UniProtKB/Swiss-Prot annotation:
PROSITE patterns: BPTI_KUNITZ_1, BPTI_KUNITZ_2. Residues 1-24 form the signal peptide. It holds the Pfam family Kunitz_BPTI. Belongs to the venom Kunitz-type family. It comes from Pseudonaja textilis textilis (Eastern brown snake). It is found in: Secreted. This is Kunitz-type serine protease inhibitor textilinin-3. GO terms for molecular function: serine-type endopeptidase inhibitor activity. GO terms for cellular component: extracellular region.
């Protein structure tokens, strides 16, 4: 294969890696945790990944405590946990 062909193949493989969504085996374990509002009483809109529905869902975060399955934006949730 020519060097141009190898460069094209390398470029395509790199692009595929970047555009491929997170697979369940690569998903962090905290994505499996339930939504947890925390100990405080604020009502801050946040997102968590629901593994049964395979999507990010909005919930109201209390402002303190909780767990790592808690994202400020749906985009952040999807890029971290959604397949």
């Amino acid at each position: 294969m020519s060097s141009g062909g190898l460069l094209l193949l390398l470029g395509l493989l790199t692009l595929w890696e970047v555009l491929t969504p997170v697979s369940s085996k690569d998903r962090p374990n905290f994505c499996k945790l339930p939504a947890e509002t925390g100990r405080c009483n604020a009502k801050i809109p946040r997102f968590y990944y629901n593994p049964r529905q395979h999507q990010c869902i909005e919930f109201l975060y209390g402002g303190c405590g909780g767990n790592a399955n808690n994202f400020k934006t749906i985009k952040e949730c999807e890029s971290t946990c959604a397949a």
